Amino acid sequence: MNLHEYQAKQLFADYGLPVSKGFACESAQEAMSAADSIGGSQWVVKAQVHAGGRGKAGGVKLVSSKEEIKAFAEKWLGHNLVTYQTDEKGQPVNKILVESCTDIDQELYLGAVMDRGTRRIVFMASTEGGVEIEKVAEETPEKILKAVIDPLVGAQPYQARELAFALGLNSDQVKQFTKIFLGLAKLFQDLDLALLEVNPLVITKGGNLHCLDAKVVVDGNALYRQPRIRDMHDPSQEDPREAHAAKWELNYVALEGNIGCMVNGAGLAMGTMDIVKLHGGAPANFLDVGGGATKERVTEAFKIILSDDNVKAVLVNIFGGIVRCDLIADGIIGAVEEVGVKIPVVVRLEGNNAELGAKKLADSGLNIIAAESLTHAAEAVVKAAEGK
């Protein structure tokens, strides 16, 4: 689960990390009042969305008057911000962050991620702050420093000092960096994070370290024991179909094609998308109904798929193991009748009672094509989507 920048900075502040004084505002008047509370003659205003690239898209601005703050708020609040990380519709801006201006002398990068390869929290630091760290990793990987955290002993001060010395920090800055490093490590572990980034971690003209930006991603599987973090969830930043799917424990990701896919099992779902692509089609979604492909879940899955106006045909690919294919076929037939599916539906059943399931589909009288194999299913659904 992603957090907004202002939420991440609240967590940083709770752990004693240096962040700018700021307020998340929902109106232009509130934003101007925030500037008065902060004081000073310059402020930074930032549109709050779950996406990077805000600065290039005009969603971050340095302002010198309350009139500029008002204009920025009126421009973005209630509107969508489109960045290179969003789709063409962008994401809605419901709040803007108004915060104090910071004098910057140098920009660094500091982040942490749960590395599945080592099964450890891995911290990364670089002198190349303020830019996309992915580009740094690709073009100059030697500029990324790493520290692997042993889960038995936790983050250690010496690891912070090693990174700080490699970044070229002076003695006072090494102490500050160590405090930030240990604070972030504790935050990461306490709150079950999957990723955090401070980009940039700046050195001010006064020589102090300051967390100018904050990105936090929480492990969704751990939200049951993180009630405070769970309450920070902003559903407006999610695709409505994905949010609806989550309520039914369906794994759904919207894509840009015209062939809806409904599959049981994530691996089979990815393979299904691959073979559709191989035969010239374009998947409209990833949808894993899981092991319990009941009529109710299949019905909801159809509703979600058909809510996408781009979908011209649907491919259902089910492997029957414990759940018999004839029962799955009953569920598909019932779902198609209940939802009133008007577009072609291609179904491939394999496994327990697959032949009986295919016969039920063929005898249903509905616009359902029973495929004999996965290749046949892919060919059939691509032709159906093309109107052939």
UniProtKB/Swiss-Prot annotation:
Binding residues for substrate? N264, G321, I322, V323
Q: Name one Pfam family in it.
A: Ligase_CoA
Domain ATP-grasp, first and last residues per copy: 9-244
Which positions in this protein are listed as binding Mg(2+)?
A: N199, D213
Q: What cofactor does this one take?
A: Mg(2+)
Functional description taken from the UniProt entry? Succinyl-CoA synthetase functions in the citric acid cycle (TCA), coupling the hydrolysis of succinyl-CoA to the synthesis of either ATP or GTP and thus represents the only step of substrate-level phosphorylation in the TCA. The beta subunit provides nucleotide specificity of the enzyme and binds the substrate succinate, while the binding sites for coenzyme A and phosphate are found in the alpha subunit.
Protein name per its UniProtKB record: Succinate--CoA ligase [ADP-forming] subunit beta
| Organism, scientific name | Hahella chejuensis (strain KCTC 2396)
